[in-house]
Regions:
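Intrinsically disordered, low-complexity terminal regions
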Residues: 1-290
Length: 290
């Protein structure tokens, strides 16, 4: 009996390895190279699969793509200083057979437009405008400075990390949004039911607007933060763990437990922070000392 079980186990392992090899055999690797000038543009439309973009050296765009079957092709076009890539689905393609995973290297000053319905959209270490859009895609942006960042998702989570001097706009239906060390003249998040988490100091002289209809909003800030903060939840609760200098004149009634408005830090350099939700909770608290 024991020998038979071992034999079945060996057969199972061989079958799994065979199936894995068959899947891998159905994949195709393609590489593209495009020479571009300064401040080029790259757009990628990929219905199924991930897109990852990092900086390259020199004025060249390098594309490494993995196609998961022969039911999808890659169309490419160069128009002036702009490179356009599109995953072209053939008859019978579905989310698995039509999948393409892209790894792309671009000059750091290249503007991006990335679209995928699923997978991961990732852009990092650039200093140019970035637009990322996907229904269920996971969006990750990090280490981007002096740029406009536009993100639009339905239910995919969004994480933006270490962005300085950015114009950041995030529009999400139900995905959770996390901003970690994100500052700039404009930082705006609008969500219908997703939660919003901000970790950072709100910078200097910026305009920060975090709004969710039914999701919770949490802002965790250090002692050095200077900000004029107003928070209001129509049907939910608000909590403030940081002493604020109350505003003398406000545009709405400050009902205990559902709204607050005050200044923390140095008013002369403070950013304007607006936190709004209809029936979610809002929590402003101090970052724990490590």
């Amino acid at each position: 009996m024991g020998g038979r079980l071992i034999d079945l186990g060996v057969r199972g392992a061989i079958l799994a390895a065979t199936m894995s090899a068959a899947v891998a055999a159905g994949q195709t690797h393609k590489e593209f190279r495009f020479n571009v000038g300064p401040k080029a543009g790259v757009s990628v439309n990929n219905p199924y699969g991930s897109i990852s973009v990092k900086p390259s050296t020199g004025n060249v765009v390098l594309v490494n793509a993995v196609l998961f079957s022969d039911r999808v092709e890659i169309d490419n076009n160069v128009a002036g200083n702009r490179v356009e890539l599109e995953s072209h689905l053939l008859a019978g393609a579905d989310a698995q057979s039509g999948r393409v995973d892209y790894e792309i290297l671009v000059p750091a000053d290249t503007s991006l437009s990335l679209h995928s319905s699923s997978g991961v959209l990732r852009a990092e270490k650039l200093h140019a405008d970035v637009s990322l859009e996907g229904s269920g895609a996971t969006v990750e942006v990090r280490d981007i400075n002096n740029a406009h960042i536009h993100v639009k998702t339905l239910n995919g989570p969004v994480t933006i990390t270490n962005v300085q001097d950015g114009h950041v706009e995030v529009d999400s239906l139900s995905g959770n949004v996390t901003l970690n060390s994100v500052t700039g003249p404009l930082v705006q998040v609008i969500s219908t039911s997703g939660g919003i988490n901000y970790l950072g100091d709100f910078g200097d002289h910026g305009d920060y607007r975090l709004t969710s209809h039914s999701g919770n909003i949490e802002a965790i800030v250090p002692d050095s933060t200077s900000a004029d903060v107003s928070a209001r939840s129509v049907r939910g609760e608000v909590h403030d763990d940081i002493p604020l200098q109350p505003k003398q004149h406000t545009s709405f009634v400050l009902k205990q437990g559902s709204a607050f408005w005050g200044t923390m830090g140095r008013a002369a350099v403070s950013s304007t922070v607006v936190l709004r939700t209809f029936n979610g909770k809002i929590h402003l608290r101090k970052r724990s000392a490590k």
